[in-house]
Regions:
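Short, internal active-site loops enriched in acidic
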Residues: 118-120
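N-terminal catalytic or cofactor-binding beta/alpha core of small enzyme domains
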Residues: 1-116, 125-137, 143-152, 156-159
Length: 159
């Protein structure tokens, strides 16, 4: 099963683009016969480590929006435990959640991050042209994810 963890706030303009992208990604992956579960949150929480470490999870994709220049495109980036630094603060990164999953539950599936470019994070529910354009790349990234799920050697190298 592919676990998609979407992070964002639909009331902060482009910050909600990650949530929309993740929902569309879920449907695109299902259309490619991938079993998917999607979790949407405002921020990453330590409790998500248990979901990540579940036996049925083959891989995890984190989706979030970041401040970017107009014209930037979303990309699938591998995550590594090597880049994780334990945190006791109020902000967790995807890599730290993977580290928690490994340390607490002894299971850490391959993981990637998709960052959606955004330029407007003011209060509101409309998306900028930059964020809207990013949503058009869902099917391409769904195919990239599916290809990685089908190649366990590639998954092992990324962690």
């Amino acid at each position: 099963m592919l676990l998609i963890i979407a992070c964002g706030n639909s009331l902060r303009s482009d910050d909600g683009a990650g949530l929309i992208f993740a929902e569309r990604l879920e449907y695109a992956c299902r259309a490619l016969d991938v079993v998917v579960e999607r979790i949407s949150v405002h921020q990453l929480l330590p409790e998500l480590a248990a979901d990540i470490a579940a036996e049925v999870v083959q891989a995890v994709v984190f989706v979030d929006t970041r401040l970017a220049a107009p014209g930037d495109l979303p990309a699938l980036q591998p995550l590594s435990l090597k880049a994780a630094s334990p945190s006791v603060g109020h902000h967790l990164t995807p890599a730290v959640l993977l580290l928690y999953a490994q340390a607490l539950y002894h299971h850490c599936p391959p993981a990637w991050q998709i960052t959606i470019p955004g330029v407007n994070f003011d209060h509101g529910e409309s998306l900028s042209e930059t964020a809207q354009n990013a949503l058009a790349h869902v099917s391409v990234l769904a195919r990239q994810i599916t290809a990685r799920l089908d190649d366990p050697r590639r998954n092992a190298k990324e962690l």
